[in-house]
Amino acid sequence: MIYHKNINMLVPYYLMYSYAYYQENESLIEDAEYDQICQDLITNWNNITHWHKPLLSLESLKAGTGYDIKYPPRVVGAAIALIKESQLKTT
């Protein structure tokens, strides 16, 4: 995935995967990968400069959840597109 090459991309993927799971009941990745994204965000927290970083909380990351995030329309649209792309691959 792109976030393996650029730590700032952890933020949008965490947000999209969280939205898909908690709002749309769509699990796009394995739980272990989601947990690893959370851990990578915590580990790299001080070096991440993504503009959506303020939407994240270390408390939620440590708990391995994205349940209480206020998702902006941009994230919602991207997550919906990711869900549709995933569904096309499985059909």
Protein language model features and the residues they cover:
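Phosphate/adenylate-binding "loop-and-lid" substructures adjacent to NTP/NAD/dNTP-binding pockets
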Residues: 1-91
